[in-house]
């Protein structure tokens, strides 16, 4: 069977020696397969490779058939989100981090010679990960890369001081909340910040988003799962200095003022992730969350 993906990009986490070594190993393996390889600019600079083709993430998205991201979930999150803004390029994650919820291929010879080989031949399963976008007071001037989230959009207190929110869903009043903040999460993000705040785990293929209160000053506040077709309007009603901040996937903090409106809805773009043919999301949950471990 011929390869389905011929022009392959490699993206790694910068300044990590073990990632750079894996990038070099991966490059050599792909060369042996006769594939065309392009390495992301900063990733290439961290290696000892010479005379290699390099490109920016935008160029990779527009020129390559597939991108392999080497690193942890954070690096995968950042790279795949940015790649998806420019094209529908599929992404493969090789884990050189800690948990590996998103980077599902192991960083070893067996994974390269069997799992990665099969995926590049087209023998794979696909997950389409939805993303969220936001705007503040209907202002559309924020850079695209700073307004799209793969995991979550969070509005949080700057120094642990409570503030007030009023939430509308599809134009209808939903609830008021005072507390440390609110997380609006995709299914992908439901195993990240949202889970730490007590939210439910959503299957990545589920067409939902979840609103998770952060330390609400009420015993009645609970996570709320809604359709990902809904439009969420969040008003900042009051706060104690300093102002609350909005972040996407833990980055790009935006300071919010009283009476400002944050509108959140599903983004048009999705991240396409390739897995092995026998990939089972529940295996990942069981392994990473220790569901099968005996505690005593």
Curated annotation (Swiss-Prot):
The active site is at residue 73. It is an enzyme of class 2 (transferase). Gene3D superfamilies: Probable inorganic polyphosphate/atp-NAD kinase, domain 1 (3.40.50.10330), Probable inorganic polyphosphate/atp-NAD kinase, domain 2 (2.60.200.30). It catalyses: NAD(+) + ATP = ADP + NADP(+) + H(+). It comes from the Bacteria. GO terms for biological process: NAD metabolic process; NADP biosynthetic process. It is found in: Cytoplasm. Its cofactor is a divalent metal cation. Pfam families: NAD_kinase (PF01513), NAD_kinase_C (PF20143). One of its GO terms (cellular component) is cytoplasm. Its main location: cytoplasm. The keyword Repressor does not apply. One of its GO terms (molecular function) is ATP binding. NAD(+) binds at residues 73-74, 78, 151-152, 178, 180, 191-196. Keywords: ATP-binding, Cytoplasm, Kinase, NAD, NADP, Nucleotide-binding, Transferase. Its EC number is 2.7.1.23. Involved in the regulation of the intracellular balance of NAD and NADP, and is a key enzyme in the biosynthesis of NADP. Catalyzes specifically the phosphorylation on 2'-hydroxyl of the adenosine moiety of NAD to yield NADP. HAMAP family: NAD_kinase (MF_00361). Belongs to the NAD kinase family. This is NAD kinase. It comes from Francisella tularensis subsp. mediasiatica (strain FSC147). The lineage of its organism: Bacteria, Pseudomonadati, Pseudomonadota, Gammaproteobacteria, Thiotrichales. The gene is nadK.
